Amino acid sequence: LYSQKLARAFVVLDPETRAQSIWHDATTQAFALGLEVVEDAGLLAEVAGLVEWPVVLMGEIGIDFLALPAEVLQTSMREHQKFFSVKNPKTGRIERFITVANNAPQDGGTLILKGNQKVLSARLSDAKFFWENDLRRIQANGLEGMGAGLSAVTFHNKLGSQAERIARIATLAAHLAPMMDVDPERAILAAK
């Protein structure tokens, strides 16, 4: 059969089979350490489409980045590296990542993981810088101070600045809030 010939050449023909293999291996590796892979069907489908012979590898996140919010870690890993997040179910913290190689590496994945961890550290250094910078700005000026410069940022040449866009969203939020049994003032604050 064609699929068997491909398998002998290290190609899994069916993307669903690749996805199942990736998910099984990822969750098994995480479970062995008492961790959980954060479900992400879109990323799983994307990664299954990128590899022919998936080999799941688990890497570590540098200790300097473990205090970042889970959302910051997940976004950096998912969007830029196509990594799955692995969390500690007791703390909810993202502690590791899963990457998928496109063939069985000779060294068991050591070199791949070393390279991926180096690239991830650079990405997370940037994320940490922006996160800490935003926190400093909020502490100094409050949340409303974050939006002060948005009047100088064009949203669209026919729709005005980002500040005008936010004002329109706040007006809409205040209008919709009572329909959802939400305090209009809180909706306005959330919109800003």
Language model region names:
Residues 1-192:
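Amphipathic alpha-helical "coupling" segments that flank catalytic cores
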